[in-house]
Design a protein with these regions (language model features):
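Catalytic grooves of carbohydrate-active enzymes
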Residues: 63-73, 86-105, 109-110, 130-298
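General marker for long, soluble alpha-helical cores
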Residues: 105, 121-128
Length: 298
């Protein structure tokens, strides 16, 4: 319905959707919503290996392969690494680039610098694995799109109608402060945004004469606001590595139990390929199938 709405799909979940319900996508993200920011913050690749999570399971090539199989196409689509539970540190960006991603989606914590006027949210970061483009969400518009008020004092933003009115007013203000400047601003919806809310926002944005709705490719190709080999991140949203480590240890223990069971009790009924398939990634694919079958997800 809204051609300007850009959908970035998790290819694992995308392939489980019935073909007649799959949305048109602007690109795919890392499979299984793998948390690259937590991976870099934990800085323990062996912990992931012990848990049965290989780098090859979530790189850009695998994302493209899963999408191509689901769509029965040889035409590649764009790949984006989506921000996880923490911030995009230089280490996280380097890992994403090494995994084949040339662009990442970041929330407003990516750049801690405060500027007087709004600017294009495109950054280029030089990493040891190569340059990577960061598409940063604009803070106020993103907060409102996520269904949140911009401050505790903004009582008028307690309802969807109030937040939508503020969103339009805010975007008009940005246009008036620099009427002849072209700036590319990113706004995303949260994972629990309802279809009704998304429809309201997109309908209003499409009717706003002062806005020109473009796409992620256009933003990625825009002149970057900053080109640097450093990241000026806001650490207030740092990844909780303790939870990640606990989860990995649990996965590792479960994987050992499963493999032990497969090799000792079920040895006659399984070959080596069957045993190697008993890992968290296989479980993730089953989870994707289960999740995709639920109808209450917007």
């Amino acid at each position: 319905k809204h051609h300007s709405l850009q959908v970035v799909a998790d290819p694992l979940y995308f392939q489980e959707l019935p073909s007649d319900t799959r949305p048109a996508v602007a690109g795919v993200m890392q499979p299984g919503d793998f948390d690259v920011t937590a991976y870099a913050a934990l800085n323990d690749a062996d912990a992931y290996t012990r848990a049965g999570i290989a780098d090859e399971a979530w790189n850009a090539e695998q994302a493209q392969t899963l999408y191509a199989v689901a769509k029965s196409t040889v035409t590649p689509t764009a790949t984006y690494a989506w921000q996880g539970s923490g911030t995009w540190s230089l280490d996280a960006l380097t890992k994403a680039r090494a995994q084949g991603y040339t662009a990442v989606i970041a929330d407003s914590t990516f750049d801690g610098e405060q500027t007087d006027t709004v600017h294009t949210g495109t950054y280029v970061v030089n990493t040891s694995a190569g340059d990577i483009t960061v598409l940063k969400e604009q803070s106020e518009l993103g907060t409102l799109a996520h269904g949140e008020a911009t401050s505790a004092r903004a009582t008028a933003e307690a309802s969807d109608a109030g937040r939508l009115a503020r969103m339009l007013a805010q975007s008009a203000f940005y246009q008036m402060e620099q009427p002849y400047a072209t700036r590319n601003l990113l706004m995303t919806f949260s994972r629990n945004s309802s279809a009704s809310w998304i429809n309201q926002v997109m309908s209003a944005m499409e009717q706003a004469s002062w806005l020109n709705l473009t796409d992620l490719n256009t933003m990625a190709a825009a002149d970057p606001y900053s080109v640097s080999s450093e990241v000026n991140q806001d650490d207030s949203n740092a990844a909780d590595v303790s939870q990640t480590r606990a989860t990995l240890e649990q996965l590792s223990s479960s994987r050992k139990d499963i493999l032990r069971l497969a090799t000792s009790i079920l040895k006659k009924g399984l070959d080596e390929d069957d045993v190697s398939s008993l890992n968290p990634q296989a479980l993730a694919r089953q989870d994707a199938s289960s999740t995709a079958s639920h109808t209450n997800d917007p």
